Amino acid sequence: MNRCWALFLSLCCYLRLVSAEGDPIPEELYEMLSDHSIRSFDDLQRLLHGDPGEEDGAELDLNMTRSHSGGELESLARGRRSLGSLTIAEPAMIAECKTRTEVFEISRRLIDRTNANFLVWPPCVEVQRCSGCCNNRNVQCRPTQVQLRPVQVRKIEIVRKKPIFKKATVTLEDHLACKCETVAAARPVTRSPGGSQEQRAKTPQTRVTIRTVRVRRPPKGKHRKFKHTHDKTALKETLGA
């Protein structure tokens, strides 16, 4: 009888595990995350109607059960080591959408696109850019306020093995404010089989008509009797007659 109950319980656990592995993440969860500001794991657990202390309490009860059941100092020491490992690991915090200092490389194309035989100093500077992740996959961290900041750099040219220093101005873009904004999804373009024909019908077509002009030749034999007449005076008299 006990063996049958054990098989039944193991089968139930297996079916539950299989169903849990194949379930996709529901869309309601994405909507729930997008409507709240979640900065830590505790906030996420509160949003999902959970208690932050349940996980730590379960681990503590498990360790205490093992220590009392064994009754040995070694098991108690293992429980203390497991609790110590939990206190060392700090909770993960979300990288919220805000401005951060980033390194921007000043390329030579920003100064002179026609010439590449020079150096730029400094080669890189610091800028403020928006970065971070949002709670929903349909939104992205984007700047809402931008400021243009001109800076002066040195353009170093080598002419006849001598360096020539020139000044150049580069405009940098700093982000002052950020916000998680909705990303417009690209609509799929559906092409019907008759779409190309309709487009051709709507497009005005210019027809070029080429007309061929034929030159009529005089009928043969009309002036055949004057073919061998070389005297112009005799030809005029004959035509005048």
UniProtKB/Swiss-Prot annotation:
**PROSITE patterns to which the protein is assigned, alphabetical:** PDGF_1 (PS00249), PDGF_2 (PS50278)
GO CC entries? basolateral plasma membrane; cell surface; collagen-containing extracellular matrix; cytoplasm; endoplasmic reticulum lumen; extracellular region; extracellular space; Golgi lumen
Q: Which UniProt keywords apply?
A: Chromosomal rearrangement, Cleavage on pair of basic residues, Developmental protein, Disease variant, Disulfide bond, Glycoprotein, Growth factor, Mitogen, Pharmaceutical, Proto-oncogene, Secreted, Signal
- The residues that the database entry marks as glycosylated are N63
Q: Where does this protein chiefly localize?
A: secreted
The biological process GO terms on file are: angiogenesis; cell chemotaxis; cellular response to growth factor stimulus; cellular response to mycophenolic acid; cellular response to platelet-derived growth factor stimulus; embryonic placenta development; gene expression; heart development
Q: Which SUPFAM superfamilies match?
A: Cystine-knot cytokines
| Stretch list, region Disordered | 216-241
Give the InterPro entries listed for this entry.
Cystine-knot_cytokine, PD_growth_factor_CS, PDGF/VEGF_dom, PDGF_N
Q: Does the keyword Disulfide bond apply?
A: yes
Which residue windows does the record flag with biased composition (Basic residues)?
Answer: 216-230
Could you tell me where this protein is found in the cell? Answer: Secreted
Q: List the disulfide bonds.
A: C97-C141, C130-C178, C134-C180
Q: Which GO terms describe its molecular function?
A: chemoattractant activity; collagen binding; growth factor activity; identical protein binding; platelet-derived growth factor binding; platelet-derived growth factor receptor binding; protein heterodimerization activity; protein homodimerization activity
Q: In which tissues is it expressed?
A: Expressed at high levels in the heart, brain (sustantia nigra), placenta and fetal kidney. Expressed at moderate levels in the brain (hippocampus), skeletal muscle, kidney and lung.
Q: Which Pfam families match?
A: PDGF, PDGF_N
Task: Give the signal sequence positions.
Answer: 1-20
Q: How does it assemble?
A: Antiparallel homodimer; disulfide-linked. Antiparallel heterodimer with PDGFA; disulfide-linked. The PDGFB homodimer interacts with PDGFRA and PDGFRB homodimers, and with heterodimers formed by PDGFRA and PDGFRB. The heterodimer composed of PDGFA and PDGFB interacts with PDGFRB homodimers, and with heterodimers formed by PDGFRA and PDGFRB. Interacts with XLKD1. Interacts with LRP1. Interacts with SORL1 (via the N-terminal ectodomain). Interacts with CD82; this interaction inhibits PDGFB-mediated signaling pathway.
Role noted for this protein: Growth factor that plays an essential role in the regulation of embryonic development, cell proliferation, cell migration, survival and chemotaxis. Potent mitogen for cells of mesenchymal origin. Required for normal proliferation and recruitment of pericytes and vascular smooth muscle cells in the central nervous system, skin, lung, heart and placenta. Required for normal blood vessel development, and for normal development of kidney glomeruli. Plays an important role in wound healing. Signaling is modulated by the formation of heterodimers with PDGFA.
Q: What family is this?
A: Belongs to the PDGF/VEGF growth factor family.
Disease association reads: Basal ganglia calcification, idiopathic, 5: A form of basal ganglia calcification, an autosomal dominant condition characterized by symmetric calcification in the basal ganglia and other brain regions. Affected individuals can either be asymptomatic or show a wide spectrum of neuropsychiatric symptoms, including parkinsonism, dystonia, tremor, ataxia, dementia, psychosis, seizures, and chronic headache. Serum levels of calcium, phosphate, alkaline phosphatase and parathyroid hormone are normal. A chromosomal aberration involving PDGFB is found in dermatofibrosarcoma protuberans. Translocation t(17;22)(q22;q13) with PDGFB.
Name of the featured protein: Platelet-derived growth factor subunit B
The source organism is Homo sapiens (Human)
